[in-house]
């Protein structure tokens, strides 16, 4: 499933990465200035023309709790050579450190690419000694010198965007450099540092996730009244540092369960770090988007799924959903929303008997089981979905009670305890995905869900909490390796046509296995829930259709409150403005679009239901592209977090979304030219919510006045650009035989007008929707096939063709030709 790394320049011919924004940014196409110091083998990376390197660093390895630095080695050898990947050449430095008595040798491979503002580095530990060594971490960046990550302006103007261990461990917050908890900004997977004065930025991002997590740390020390970066390092390491933090699953665990990662490297063997991208630019949006696209190509990301629109149970019922309420909501969705495109029906946690026993329903709430009910959901024309936490096992589950040997253990042979389901109820443990018995359990569970219950979409949660270091059945296994093993088994079991959604999990490790991925924390029936989730949705915008299709969590727009869920259940109903905030936040993600309200409650409120039926918002989701957070790193202090999002839907049409996250009235003046629109253009601007025109005395700017807790969504049409229907091209077989399953695919014929979806008419009374569809004709004939590309504002394009079908379906009994069907293992 994963692709071995072999260079990254070939993955940059991407078409249009995104809208080119004028946000004090310049093109970031210049190659970096890379050098290896002959005196000590350290490396420097900077931008052309700069008087100093932005980064000067060595490498290191942690062995048995102590750090060994490259500067300690008495010998180093530097070799350079041109290397080639699929498209471009690169210059590679190979720097080998040796001669330190009793210690393994260290080597780093550093590549720089022509015309690309990035480099990449990987460290290799070679055990040249006569005895095994135990490796805990490999450090690819150990910054040295007095000027660390200097962006040519006062460090007090730096802002730091640190990705986190998972979508909400912890919640993402963009910090000023001085706002460093315990003197450190820690990121997992990636970290962006941007200076608001120089507009320069440096970005570090993990390119691989083969064995380790990548942890980045910016250490901050005061310098008079101004902060400065005193140290910076990037490690390939285990998860224990993260799981033992205040939000981690081992925060309250016994010392025996807090195992540091220790990988044994035999004499003569090698161990590699993860590969790390280093990028420097004056366009941080481009840095993030380029990184996302590289990840998509390297890991064969599954990003082709159509955007799901539907309903989920969690914020409507939490643990309280039962059979009757589920069927009522399914019937309501089918009768009132399916015709608009809402057809996913997702049952979240609460249906199962125990975590770790997902194919056994709780008879108290689902007395007739789930198989029959999910068939009813399917018969309503809905897509059934289910929640699981694949690698968590509770003490009530069959696995824990019958096979504790299938669990991850500590050094004393006891299962590692990772907390409780809620409030010290139901202790949790970790499934060992390297154990053959546990692997068979996974196959049986997910085969039952898919083949027995008919599930077509599966959410996989709490993979962050279960990613612990420990003693696995397969020795020398890391938490990341074990997780990938489990994901591989699940994907092989369910097949390619079942949709998998990464919920609680690290970001990079599941890429290539999952179709969807949660990008921020849980939402709910409060404005605070939307506000807290918004920064994560903004910060990870570039992951949408690069890592996976984004899952922003469900929106809530009704007046429903859930009194016994104090966190996000809401003590008072959402105001109309707050309801608009919730649904607009989902729309700007460009990802999954799920209703989180009890549907009959929503249906009793026509004004709230109208939000769910708003075509412009639905089109933002169906288009599948994220709105760019224009002020991601430049938001005003008065706003407190990114507030302005831009989606260029077509050369003619743009959507501008402006949030007010504060508790007071806010006013923004948005220059249309700053959005990449012609300064002297003629525009028709309307409000997406009420469809009324927006007038402005200044045609070059848009004044946005907002009350507290509100959002404005504007549709901006450049009237100088003519409206066009999308152009579509159908790919198909030239002919077929009766009974033969034929494949049909539709593609945009150009990039001018966007396409929301494709609708097929096969000429025999059957129609389907989708980019790739199959159909079989039952009799010979020449059929007129048509595919319609649905565009914005009802403008549609089409392609048609004649398809000759010959022969007939044999009705003879031919037992010699029969073949026994075998399902996936």
Kindly give the residue locations of the regions a language model identified:
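Polysaccharide-binding surfaces and accessory modules of carbohydrate-active proteins
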Residues: 26-236
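Exposed beta-strand face motif in extracellular beta-rich ectodomains
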Residues: 119, 712, 781-785
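Short Pro-Gly-centered flexible turn/kink motifs
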Residues: 262-282, 706-717
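Aromatic-lined carbohydrate-binding/catalytic grooves of carbohydrate-active enzymes
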Residues: 307-447, 451-473
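Glycan-recognition surfaces
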Residues: 401-440, 485-602
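Carbohydrate-binding surface patches
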Residues: 586-589, 594, 635-677, 709, ...
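C-terminal beta-strand-rich structural cap/linker in extracellular carbohydrate-active enzymes
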Residues: 696-725
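Extracellular/lumenal mature domains of secreted and surface-exposed proteins
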Residues: 718-825
């Amino acid at each position: 499933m994963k692709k071995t790394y072999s260079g990254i320049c070939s993955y940059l011919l991407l078409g249009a990465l995104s809208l080119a924004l004028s946000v004090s940014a310049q093109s970031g196409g210049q190659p970096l200035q890379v050098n290896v110091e002959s005196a000590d083998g350290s490396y420097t990376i900077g931008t052309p023309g700069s008087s100093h390197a932005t980064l000067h660093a060595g490498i290191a390895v942690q062995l048995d709790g102590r750090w060994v630095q490259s500067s300690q080695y008495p010998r180093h050898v530097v070799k350079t050579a041109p290397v080639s990947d699929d498209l471009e050449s690169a210059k590679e430095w190979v720097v080998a450190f040796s001669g330190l008595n009793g210690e393994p040798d260290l080597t780093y491979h550093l590549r720089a690419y022509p015309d690309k503002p990035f480099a990449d580095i990987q460290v290799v530990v070679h055990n040249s000694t006569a005895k095994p060594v135990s490796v805990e971490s490999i450090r690819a960046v150990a910054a040295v010198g007095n000027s660390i990550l200097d962006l040519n302006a006062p460090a007090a103007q730096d802002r730091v965007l640190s990705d986190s261990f998972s979508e909400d461990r912890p919640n993402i917050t963009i910090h000023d450099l001085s706002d460093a908890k315990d003197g450190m900004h820690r990121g997992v997977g990636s970290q962006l540092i941007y200076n608001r004065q120089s507009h320069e930025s440096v970005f570090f991002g993990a390119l691989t996730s083969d064995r380790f997590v990548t942890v980045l740390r910016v250490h901050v020390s005061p310098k008079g009244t101004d902060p400065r970066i005193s140290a910076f390092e990037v490690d390939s390491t285990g998860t224990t540092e993260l799981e033992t933090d205040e939000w981690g699953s081992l925060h309250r665990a016994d010392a025996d369960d807090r195992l540091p990662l220790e990988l044994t490297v035999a004499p003569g063997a090698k161990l590699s770090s993860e590969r790390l991208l280093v990028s420097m630019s004056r366009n941080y949006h481009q840095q993030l988007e380029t990184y996302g696209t590289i990840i998509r190509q390297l890991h064969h990301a599954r990003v082709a799924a159509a955007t799901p629109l539907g309903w989920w149970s969690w914020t409507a019922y939490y643990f309280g959903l039962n059979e009757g309420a589920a069927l009522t909501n399914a019937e309501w969705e089918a009768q009132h929303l399916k015709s608009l495109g809402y057809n996913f029906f997702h049952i979240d946690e609460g249906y199962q008997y125990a975590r770790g026993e997902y194919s056994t329903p709780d008879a108290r709430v689902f007395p007739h089981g789930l198989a029959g009910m999910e068939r009813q959901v399917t018969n309503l024309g809905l897509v059934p979905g289910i929640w699981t936490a694949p690698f968590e096992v509770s003490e009530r589950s069959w696995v824990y009670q019958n096979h504790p040997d299938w669990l991850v253990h500590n050094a004393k042979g006891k299962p590692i305890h990772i907390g409780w389901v809620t409030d010290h109820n139901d202790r949790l443990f970790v499934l060992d995905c390297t154990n053959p018995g546990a692997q068979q359990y996974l196959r049986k569970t997910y085969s039952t869900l898919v083949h027995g219950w008919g599930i077509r979409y599966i959410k996989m949660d709490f993979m962050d909490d279960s990613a612990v270091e420990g003693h696995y059945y397969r020795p020398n296994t890391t938490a990341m390796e074990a997780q990938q093993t489990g994901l591989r088994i699940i994907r092989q079991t369910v097949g390619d046509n079942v949709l998998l959604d990464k919920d609680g999990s690290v970001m990079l490790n599941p890429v290539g296995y999952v179709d969807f991925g949660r990008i921020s924390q849980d939402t709910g029936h409060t404005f605070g829930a939307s506000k807290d989730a918004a920064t994560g949705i903004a910060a990870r915008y570039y992951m949408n259709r690069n890592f996976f299709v984004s899952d922003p969590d469900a929106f809530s727009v009704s007046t429903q409150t859930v009194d016994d869920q104090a966190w996000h259940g809401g003590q008072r109903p959402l105001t109309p403005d707050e309801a608009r905030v919730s649904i607009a936040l989902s729309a700007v993600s460009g990802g999954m679009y799920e209703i989180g309200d009890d549907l009959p409650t929503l249906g009793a409120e026509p004004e709230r239901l109208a939000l769910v039926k708003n075509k412009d918002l639905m089109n933002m989701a169906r288009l599948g592209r994220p709105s760019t957070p224009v002020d991601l790193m430049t938001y005003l202090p008065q706003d407190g977090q990114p507030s302005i999002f831009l989606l260029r839907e077509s050369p003619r049409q743009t959507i501008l979304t402006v949030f007010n996250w504060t508790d007071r009235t806010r006013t923004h003046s948005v220059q249309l030219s700053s959005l990449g629109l012609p300064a002297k253009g003629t525009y028709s601007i309307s409000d997406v919510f009420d469809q009324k025109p927006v007038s402005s005395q200044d045609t070059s700017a848009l004044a946005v006045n907002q009350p507290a807790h509100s959002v404005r969504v504007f549709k901006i049409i450049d009237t100088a650009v003519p409206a066009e229907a999308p152009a579509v091209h159908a790919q198909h077989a030239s002919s077929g035989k009766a009974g033969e399953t034929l494949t049909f695919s539709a593609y945009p014929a150009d990039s001018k007008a966007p396409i929301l979806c494709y609708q097929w008419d096969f000429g025999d009374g059957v129609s389907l929707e989708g980019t790739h569809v199959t159909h079989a004709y039952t009799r010979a004939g020449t059929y007129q096939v048509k595919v319609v590309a649905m565009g914005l504002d009802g403008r549609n394009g089409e392609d048609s063709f004649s398809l000759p079908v010959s022969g007939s379906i044999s009705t003879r009994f031919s037992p010699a030709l029969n073949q026994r069907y075998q399902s996936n293992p």
